[in-house]
Every structure is written in C-alpha cells, then in structure tokens.
Amino acid sequence: MLGPILCDQLCGKGKFTAETAEANPDVLLIAVERCREAMVVAMEKAKAMGLKNVYYIDMDVEKIEEIFAGEEIDRLFINFPDPWPRKKNAKRRLTYRTFLDKYCRVIKLGGEIHYKTDNAPLFEFSVEEFAACGLEVKNLTRNLHENGIVGIMTGYEEKFHALGTPINRCEVVCKPFVLPKEEKKTAEDAE
C-alpha cells in the first residue's frame, strides 16, 4: 500500500530530500528540480544512501498539474525559492496566487504546504498571498532556529543559519479557493 505522497519543489542538490526520505521510509517523496546538474547530485546522494522511496522529476514548477492528479499530494515543500525581488516579477514567485491555485489543486484537501525562506520581504509577500487566497497559515515563525535547530535543514538553510540569518517558516493548509482578482498595475509596480 502506498503511503503519503510528499513533493519537494526545487529540491536542489537534494540534502533535504534525501534526509526527509530516510527519516520517513513509509512515504513516497517526489523531488522536482529543473536544473539537471543539481538533480544529478541529488539522485546520486539518494542512491548512495540506498533510498527506495524517492523519485526525481526534471520539470518546471508551472507544470505541476501535468504530473500530479487532483488531490494526490499530502504535503508540498517549498524551500528557499528565488525571491524575484522586483515588483514586476511578483508573478514568478512560487508563492504567488496562481501557483497557490495549482498547488491546492494537486494537494489533498487539508494537505499542507511547508514553506521556508531566509528572505524576509518574500516571506511577508507570501503570508499576504496566503491570506488573500483564504488559506490557513499555522506554525508561523520568523526565526525558526532561534532556540536550536528544528527539523531537517536544507543546504542553503545550513549556510544561512551559520551566518546567523533568521529562517522564516510556516505551514499552509490547502483548501479550494477562488483566485483573488488581479490588482490594477501602477507605475510603482514596474520597479
């Protein structure tokens, strides 16, 4: 019998993916990465660890609905995505409402998105997007490792933690929602 299905979006070199799969042998972990060089490193790591419950997909995140059926995933991890800091690129952020809509279509009702970033402005933007979409945010922290290391860390996370950079984290409960209407663009948005 197939256990819970977890998806690690943009798994990078696979430290988090491999350690999560090793700690949870009863789950099926699907790792998505569009950079083939990073994915090869991740795959070699999983093979060296003898992991049988992790699979890798070379895919752009935008195509998630082409790979997964409706309400198939139990948990989706988004760890340290590109912040796309310019306002005009907000739609490229992996926590923008159109991405959230796609995620909530493939994540089971009541399933979760676990989200981590070192980028405070991106985190605030993301929390606002979650709220605008009517999604429940829980276990929100702006300094995850303040009192010691919590959970499995990504490679980026280890580096940022060593530098003393606070790690922002939250969990988002997925449910059906209607995409909020797009706001009218202003000259300031083009920055």
Which ranges hold each PLM region?
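Conserved S-adenosyl-L-methionine
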Residues: 10
